[in-house]
């Protein structure tokens, strides 16, 4: 990590900057440049500093995430709420990508480390049709998939058009993870 709290990776000669939560909030709140990786078609559709997303960031900043009980925590009714969970990471091959239509996922690791695979929903092979009651569908993973490793205190903001596979082993062996997923109505 550099002095700005960024980790750098260079896939295919493209540098992606991943900010940890504290640094992202500091930079974004001052109006300084932050990097977002998205397709051109989807980038204009999202404002990553809307009032609802700001409520999600505030919840993550103002709470002791490690002390939160597992289950649902209401923030702003059905518009913004958090699901707290604990699990052991598994090999990526053991999971399917998931996607939502109604909510962004703001995923924050409270402790542990995990890899999250991400791919645009468009063009993915459906493994389970959309379940309207639970707002999710499952998809087969493309090869190769894009992934990011989340450490404690880091977030990934995943819009509805990005399928994602959280909970994957990040290093050599499974680890126990506690994570807060704030659901933000799109």
Tell me what each language-model feature is.
Residues 1-4:
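Methionine residue identity
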Residues 12-34:
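Short, Lys/Arg-enriched N-terminal segments with co-localized hydrophobic residues
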Residues 29-84, 96-99:
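A short, N-terminal "cap"/entry segment at the start of jelly-roll beta-barrel domains
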Residues 83-100, 113-124:
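Conserved short histidine dyad/triad with adjacent acidic residue
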Residues 102-104, 108-116, 123, 132-136:
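Glycine- and acidic-residue-biased ligand/ion/polar-headgroup-sensing regions
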Residues 106, 155-157, 174-186:
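A short hydrophobic beta-strand segment most commonly corresponding to one strand
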Residues 128-143:
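Non-DNA-binding regulatory cores of transcription-related proteins
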Residues 150-168:
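Conserved metal-binding segment of the jelly-roll/cupin
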């Amino acid at each position: 990590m550099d002095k700005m709290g960024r980790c750098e990776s260079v896939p295919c000669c493209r540098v992606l900057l991943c900010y940890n939560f504290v640094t992202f909030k500091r930079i974004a709140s001052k109006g300084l440049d932050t990097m977002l990786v998205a397709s051109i078609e989807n980038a204009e559709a999202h404002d990553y500093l809307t009032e609802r997303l700001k409520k999600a960031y505030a919840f993550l900043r103002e709470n002791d995430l490690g002390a939160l009980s597992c289950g649902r925590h209401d923030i702003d009714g059905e518009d913004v709420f958090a699901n707290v969970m604990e699990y052991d990471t598994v090999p990526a091959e053991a999971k399917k990508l998931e996607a939502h239509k109604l909510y962004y996922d703001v995923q924050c690791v409270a402790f542990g480390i995990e890899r999250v695979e991400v791919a645009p929903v468009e063009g993915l092979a459906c493994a389970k049709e959309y379940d309207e009651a639970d707002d999710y569908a499952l998809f087969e993973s493309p090869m190769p998939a894009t992934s990011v490793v989340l450490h404690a205190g880091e977030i990934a903001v995943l819009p509805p058009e990005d399928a994602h596979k959280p909970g994957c082993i990040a290093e050599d062996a499974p680890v126990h993870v506690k994570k807060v997923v704030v659901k933000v109505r799109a």
